[in-house]
Design a protein with these regions (language model features):
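Acidic, surface-exposed loops and disordered segments
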Residues: 1-235
Length: 235
């Protein structure tokens, strides 16, 4: 028995998150025959609902917003703090479907994987690493959509977001190379929509500044742009 939805929604959201994860895993994917031959799952699902962890995500996002002078990160940071939970769905240890479709610009999957091997390794410090197989990115979108549909069947409000997923990846909460966060709430109004952009004065110094996020593009001596967590961008 419960006397208020507040008493029940923690367990409710966790249960629905499990069902959403199942929907993401069982969603259609390219190269289904490869699974029948023993290939492993490449969809990662991680659920987070702890208030301290959600606050960590929000702090990272606020610092990211200050670094880039982008208020939208501050808006989504406030949203992260208000969530009942977030289900992260991403591509981890993916492999191509061996369709040789050419959508990546290469004639074969093998050629694409070999030609981009070094770039994928070097981009691991980026907010998301890449490049990816286009079909696998489509698979990720289908998985996220399937999860959102499952949540809607049980009247849990969601919104698909990438900024919270970036924070989770950079904080080591998920291992995916690219991911989407399915924010989950049980409230009178879905807080993921219609939130106003906060007023922000980026010229005011914070009294207690967090460490740099390491996501500011910095031009290296060889003329390339990199995300260097060991360097702080010039003012």
């Amino acid at each position: 028995m419960f006397h208020s939805i507040d008493e029940a929604k923690g367990e409710l959201v966790r249960t629905v998150a499990r069902l959403c994860a199942a929907a993401a895993v069982t969603a259609p994917k390219s190269g289904g025959q490869l699974f029948l031959r023993g290939k492993p799952l490449f969809i990662e699902t991680v659920f987070i609902d702890g208030r301290e962890t959600l606050a960590r995500l929000a702090r990272w996002m606020r610092q990211r917003g200050r670094e880039r002078r982008q208020a939208i990160w501050l808006r989504d940071a406030a949203l992260a703090e208000s969530l009942d939970g977030a289900l992260f769905i991403g591509l981890k240890d993916w492999y191509p479907p061996i369709y040789d479709c050419g959508a990546c610009g290469f004639a074969t999957c093998a050629e694409f994987m070999e030609a981009t091997r070094q770039r994928r390794a070097e981009s691991d410090l980026f907010e998301f690493s890449g490049p990816h197989c286009n079909l696998r990115d489509i698979d990720l979108g289908i998985a996220v959509g399937s999860a959102a549909k499952a949540a809607s069947l049980y009247s849990v409000d969601t919104r698909c977001q990438t900024r919270i997923a970036v924070a989770a990846r950079k904080l080591g909460l998920i291992q995916s190379e690219v991911a989407v966060a399915l924010s989950m709430t049980v409230t009178h109004k879905n807080p993921g929509f219609d939130a106003r952009m906060p007023a922000a004065d980026f010229d005011v110094r914070e009294t207690a500044r967090d460490l740099p996020t390491g996501t500011m593009p910095i031009k290296t001596p060889d003329g390339r742009w990199q995300h260097r967590p060991d360097l702080e961008p010039e003012e």
